[in-house]
């Protein structure tokens, strides 16, 4: 099961006592700020969680799996995430819920 933005908003509503609308707006504003920073070429550092970085990938050779034809994979910019030590440690020591 995956955590969704709607579930995040519901959790904020329950834990902080803010209205459901405010909780939803808060979650949306947070992710919009992350998106905007990345669009502007900025790294996003979330202390105790991890870093979102931008990485430029060069063009490289590829192959069409259906035809076997060689095709170039175009250069592009990608977002990467590197978890922080605290997050790594918590995940490593967590007991998965089933």
UniProtKB/Swiss-Prot annotation:
Residues 50-71 are annotated as: Disordered. InterPro entries: Hist_DNA-bd, Histone-like_DNA-bd_CS, IHF-like_DNA-bd_dom_sf, IHF_alpha. Keywords: DNA recombination, DNA-binding, Transcription, Transcription regulation, Translation regulation. GO terms for cellular component: cytosol. GO terms for biological process: DNA recombination; positive regulation of metabolic process; regulation of DNA-templated transcription; regulation of translation. One of its GO terms (molecular function) is structural constituent of chromatin. Heterodimer of an alpha and a beta chain. This protein is one of the two subunits of integration host factor, a specific DNA-binding protein that functions in genetic recombination as well as in transcriptional and translational control. Belongs to the bacterial histone-like protein family. This is Integration host factor subunit alpha. It comes from Proteus mirabilis (strain HI4320). The lineage of its organism: Bacteria, Pseudomonadati, Pseudomonadota, Gammaproteobacteria, Enterobacterales. The gene is ihfA.
